[in-house]
């Protein structure tokens, strides 16, 4: 199976090996890997072909039992329009792109992300929103930390209303404890007579009751506190926006905008805030700037907030978003338009309120009719058990005396035999239940969202005396303010228009379907189409994360296998799949270390971090309640052992951990890694190995064997999950046995029939569901199942081979900054441009923009060393593309030499004016001292960037993060 995944043929592999002076891949790896490090045991995972893989996945899918979920709790049935499924979720132009650090070749997804931000701002009534977060519970934690940063209060108390979802409450407790925040319960109606920095309430409480939060927020604001709302986007199409209620921050999940539940995700959450908080906002933020031709263009703005720049002082450790899901969610809004969204919400509300009224006519006691979609019943007796066992209905059981029923886009349709099944459970006539949908069809809900139309609509509804709807029409929290008025939300409700719009946007972007993306530390390898197919199969996609475990037998077997495989491949004893990104895996691992020391009554909080480490490491350490102490690197880019010993001994009483990336962020296998781990262990600390570079390890080296106590792995790098334009990802944490009990909590013990010990994970949860973004795990399962252990080992060796081949080919063009044993690199290497910049004035930014003209995505720029490019080609690239990249870098060097010898003007040359757009080439005006053909580097099938070079400084000086007005 590896023949399809690995780009170069055997003959081409032999050619590259010969060029480097090695006879086999194993010879090369033996020469590159450090001496004295234990080889992994022979892990036997057989390889399989595509058909066998899909057949096995189909068998797992049949083991799942999809019942009618009315569980709610932030996860809802929804309909994914085929136009979105086909044109976004199954389209490599969208799912194989990377985070848009190079904005000129990312204008399509940047436009969709600013559409997403605009949608969130409109619906929440707040001025600024980011480009999506991870799961809803971790987003709630980020909202809490944002409130703490911007509050005028010195208090450490955060008030949490008792109506929030319990899984969100548990994650808040985990995150608050680590940073010294005290969570204080706030029962409904309780007065506040003490200082607090923030208050958080759920707009529609977990019980379903709609809360008028204005009095609560008014009291808190007088005390200098920040007011936070958890809200539902669909509900906000009918009810007053959080901003109008007085909220300073609003967050929630966009899952019900067309994103399947998939046993917990992937999905996109959102976070919006007052404009004054824009520089404290976590996560990615897309803004409007201008390009060199004075055209509007989009870019990531205010990046100085983020961890890759501010490290331990960053606003968050989140270094990505859930871009693909955010794009699908906003496309859902464009597909339906504001009227269509209102209609969906109105039907849900109509059916929910109507059903609650029918229940009140029975022996059941309903808590409130003041609801959007959820009904709480106070005396259900055995309803839950009977509904599930006899009628395949899932209700949320609060306790023995209370249950909740939630209607959504699917169940509110009352299709099929759902009315009959509900009738048998509750003793209500099925005709009366079915009539709720008919009543909806007779009601005009078009007036919501416009003040004047709303006022006129009230009398219209009243005159028709439609009692089912009069509560909504007269509700004190009804929404009068408009939203989604921009043409981008009103011009694409027809499928042809939306299809063409999405196609036009994808054509603006550079993804793996266009060419190589040699981003260092990113591993932009093949995301095989067949591996992605099962993600949207209904047996997987429609599984609620809080469904009974017996309903998820197939998915849980897949999870068991992945956990066992990952543990064996990395050398650890336990795995948690809960982290929804690599950053969250880091946090989970560090919290496990923290929990371990707390269990021993030891106060250890110092985290040693090499100066070369990614900024996420430092930001994660701070969020885990640790103090960062930086360890120097030597001239070869390795950890300075003398400085490590000094820092470890100096902090011996408080040393908790060392975070180290392996291979290093400098692209080499550090020879002294075992000694590094021994030093930390000697002084009582734990070793956290960042697994971001595991594509250089699998099959040859296990971080758990050379001294690692805990690591995270990036399934979106090493194990085939696509990057999705900046997310979603999965960052499972793997740990030794002594840390296993402190991994994120889950309700289920790993089955002892597998190779892993049965250990209960009792650490605090860090995500909304036990298995995080479980819906993407099928991709990694298929990747491992098809390649097998030997195929993955070959992938590692070919990735290292290609990196060394390119590095040696280009060593006389630009120097390779760091090498390891035998002058070899790992799976990536750093090209040093600093001397060239000094003599020519050509910067790495100029080179990156010029690479666009040649049809390449730029390598990673100025990380980990300013003035350099880090190149990671991966094992999947065809040899022809590798050769084209080498030729391109040499051509760019020749262009730089023409600047040095003054053949080219130092400020008006193909590099300084890159990238070159089709608009520029087609223009009658050409004010450049080189030809158009020289500028564009024309080839067959050429990719044209959508914008000229974008002005970064302008974008940061003029913050504008919603859809700009369309030109006349």
From Swiss-Prot:
Report keywords, A-Z: Oxidoreductase, Pyridoxal phosphate
GO cellular component: a single term: cytosol
The biological process GO terms on file are: glycine decarboxylation via glycine cleavage system
Q: What molecular functions are annotated in GO for this chain?
A: glycine binding; glycine dehydrogenase (decarboxylating) activity; pyridoxal phosphate binding
Q: Which catalytic reaction applies to this protein? A: N(6)-[(R)-lipoyl]-L-lysyl-[glycine-cleavage complex H protein] + glycine + H(+) = N(6)-[(R)-S(8)-aminomethyldihydrolipoyl]-L-lysyl-[glycine-cleavage complex H protein] + CO2
Positions bearing N6-(pyridoxal phosphate)lysine: 717
Identify the domain of life: Bacteria
Q: Which Pfam families match?
A: Aminotran_5, GcvP2_C, GDC-P
* Co-factor(s): pyridoxal 5'-phosphate
Q: Give the UniProt family note.
A: Belongs to the GcvP family.
Role according to the record: The glycine cleavage system catalyzes the degradation of glycine. The P protein binds the alpha-amino group of glycine through its pyridoxal phosphate cofactor; CO(2) is released and the remaining methylamine moiety is then transferred to the lipoamide cofactor of the H protein.
Name used for this protein in its record: Glycine dehydrogenase (decarboxylating)
UniProt lists the gene as gcvP
């Amino acid at each position: 199976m590896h023949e399809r995944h690995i780009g170069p043929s055997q003959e081409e592999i032999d050619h590259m090996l010969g060029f480097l002076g090695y006879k086999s891949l194993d010879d090369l790896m033996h020469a590159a890997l450090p001496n004295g490090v234990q080889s992994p045991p022979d892990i036997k995972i057989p390889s399989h072909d595509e058909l066998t893989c899909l057949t096995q996945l189909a068998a797992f899918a049949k083991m799942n039992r999809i019942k009618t979920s009315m569980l709610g709790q932030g996860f809802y049935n929804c309909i994914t329009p085929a136009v979105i499924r086909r044109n976004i979720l199954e389209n490599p132009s969208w799912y194989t792109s990377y985070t848009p650090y190079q904005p000129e070749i990312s204008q399509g997804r940047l436009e969709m992300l600013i559409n997403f931000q605009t949608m969130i701002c409109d619906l929440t009534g707040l001025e600024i929103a980011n480009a999506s977060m991870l799961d809803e519970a971790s987003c709630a934690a980020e909202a809490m930390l944002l409130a703490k940063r911007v509050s005028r209060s010195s208090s450490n108390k955060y008030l949490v209303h008792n109506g929030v979802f319990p899984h969100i409450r548990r994650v808040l407790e985990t995150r608050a404890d680590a940073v010294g925040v005290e969570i204080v319960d706030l029962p409904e109606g309780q007065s506040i007579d003490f200082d607090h920095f923030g208050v958080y309430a759920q707009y529609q409480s977990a019980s379903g009751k709609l809360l008028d939060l204005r009095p609560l927020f008014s009291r808190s604001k007088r005390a200098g506190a920040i007011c936070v709302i958890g809200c539902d986007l669909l509900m906000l199409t009918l009810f007053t926006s959080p901003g109008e209620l007085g909220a300073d921050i609003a967050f929630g999940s966009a899952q019900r905008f067309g994103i399947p539940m998939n046993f917990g995700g992937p999905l996109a959450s959102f976070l919006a805030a007052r404009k004054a908080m824009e520089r404290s906002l976590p996560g990615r933020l897309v803004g409007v700037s201008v390009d060199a031709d004075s055209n509007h263009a989009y870019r990531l703005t205010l990046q100085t907030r983020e961890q890759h720049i501010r490290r331990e002082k960053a606003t968050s450790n989140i270094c990505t978003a859930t871009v693909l899901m955010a794009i699908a969610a906003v496309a859902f809004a464009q597909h339906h338009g504001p009227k269509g969204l209102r209609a969906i919400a109105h039907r849900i509300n109509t059916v929910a309120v109507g059903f609650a009224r029918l229940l009140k006519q029975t022996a059941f006691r309903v808590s409130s009719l003041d609801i959007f979609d959820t009904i709480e019943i106070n005396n259900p007796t055995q309803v839950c058990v009977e509904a599930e066992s006899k009628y395949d209905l899932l209700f949320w059981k609060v306790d023995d005396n209370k249950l909740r029923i939630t209607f959504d886009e699917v169940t509110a349709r009352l299709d099929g035999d759902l009315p009959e099944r509900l009738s048998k459970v509750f003793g209500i006539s099925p005709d009366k239940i079915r009539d709720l949908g008919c009543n909806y069809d007779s009601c005009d809900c078009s007036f919501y969202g416009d003040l004047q139309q709303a006022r006129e609509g009230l009398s219209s509804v009243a005159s028709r005396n439609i009692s089912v709807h009069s509560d909504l029409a007269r509700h004190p929290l009804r929404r009068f303010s408009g939203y989604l008025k921009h043409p981008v939300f009103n011009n694409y409700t027809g499928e042809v228009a939306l299809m063409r719009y999405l196609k036009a946007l994808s054509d603006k972007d550079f993804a793996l379907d266009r060419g190589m993306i040699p981003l260092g530390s990113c591993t932009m390898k093949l995301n095989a189409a067949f591996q992605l197919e099962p993600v949207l199969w209904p047996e997987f996609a429609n599984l609620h994360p809080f469904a009974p475990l017996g309903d998820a037998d197939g998915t849980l077997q897949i999870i068991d296998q992945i956990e066992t495989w990952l543990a064996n491949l990395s050398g650890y004893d336990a795995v948690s799949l809960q982290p929804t990104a690599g950053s969250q895996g880091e946090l989970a691992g560090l919290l496990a270390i923290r929990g371990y020391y707390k269990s021993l009554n030891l106060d250890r909080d110092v985290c040693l971090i090499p100066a070369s480490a990614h900024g996420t490491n430092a930001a994660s350490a701070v969020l885990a309640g640790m103090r960062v102490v930086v360890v120097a690197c030597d001239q070869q880019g390795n950890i300075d052992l003398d400085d490590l010993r000094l820092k470890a001994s100096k902090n011996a009483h408080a040393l908790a951990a060392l975070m180290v990336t392996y291979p290093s962020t400098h692209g080499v296998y550090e020879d002294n890694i075992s000694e590094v781990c021994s030093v930390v262990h000697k002084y009582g600390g734990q070793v956290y190995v960042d697994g971001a570079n595991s594509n250089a390890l699998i099959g040859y080296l296990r971080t758990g064997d050379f001294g690692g106590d805990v690591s995270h792995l990036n399934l979106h790098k090493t194990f085939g999950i696509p990057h999705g334009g900046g997310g979603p990802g999965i960052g499972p944490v793997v740990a030794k046995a002594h840390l296993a009990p402190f991994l994120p909590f889950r309700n289920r013990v790993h089955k002892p029939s597998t190779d892993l010990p049965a250990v209960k994970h009792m650490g605090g949860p860090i995500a909304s569901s036990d298995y995080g973004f479980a819906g993407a795990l099928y991709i990694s399962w298929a990747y491992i199942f098809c390649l097998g252990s030997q195929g993955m080992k070959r992938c590692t060796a070919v990735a290292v081979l290609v990196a060394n081949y390119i590095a040696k080919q280009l060593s006389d063009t630009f120097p390779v900054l760091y090498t390891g044993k035998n002058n070899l690199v790992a799976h990536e290497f750093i090209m040093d441009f600093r001397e060239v910049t000094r003599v020519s004035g050509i910067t790495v930014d100029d080179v990156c923009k010029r690479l666009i003209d040649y049809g390449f995505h730029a390598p990673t720029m100025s990380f980990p060393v300013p003035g350099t490019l880090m190149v990671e080609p991966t094992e999947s690239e065809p040899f022809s593309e590798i050769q084209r990249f080498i030729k391109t870098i040499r051509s760019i060097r020749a262009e730089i030499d023409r600047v040095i010898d003054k053949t080219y003007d130092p400020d008006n040359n193909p590099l300084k004016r890159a990238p070159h757009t089709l608009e520029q080439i087609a223009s009658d005006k050409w004010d450049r001292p080189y030809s158009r053909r020289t500028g564009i580097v024309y080839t067959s099938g050429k990719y044209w960037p959508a914008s000229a070079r974008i002005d970064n400084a302008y974008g940061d000086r003029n913050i504008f993060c919603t859809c700009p007005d369309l030109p006349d």
